[in-house]
Amino acid sequence: MTESDFNKRLKTLSLIALKVIIKGTGLKTKSELLLWKFYIEGKSYYEIADDLGIKSSSVGKALWNAKKELQTIISNEKELIPDEVKPYIELLLQKQ
């Protein structure tokens, strides 16, 4: 799956599915926070920067890294993801 397709699919998931995926895949704390604030709380780059004490100019790159980490976990470490999270991962991976 291309990075662009992955991003589009993340945006189409329900909030419940996103919450389960973000909290249940074993992301690093910073990645989890970034994705949560952006997708669940709907915060802007400026708000995220303020909340996390980072420069707003670095939020985009940090989010890209967090999405890349999530994609890597889903692609390469799927067997480590808890069983209760896997149905939500399947939703993300379904072709639309």
Where are the model-predicted features located?
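Amphipathic alpha-helical segment used for protein-protein interaction
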Residues: 2-31
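C-terminal edge and immediately downstream basic/flexible tail or linker adjoining helix-turn-helix-like DNA-binding
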Residues: 3-6, 68-96
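Generic detection of well-ordered alpha-helical segments
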Residues: 12-15, 32-33, 64, 68, ...
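Short amphipathic alpha helix immediately N-terminal
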Residues: 24-44
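Hydrophobic positions on the alpha-helical face of helix-turn-helix-like DNA-binding modules
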Residues: 34-35, 47-49, 59
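DNA-recognition helix of helix-turn-helix
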Residues: 52-77
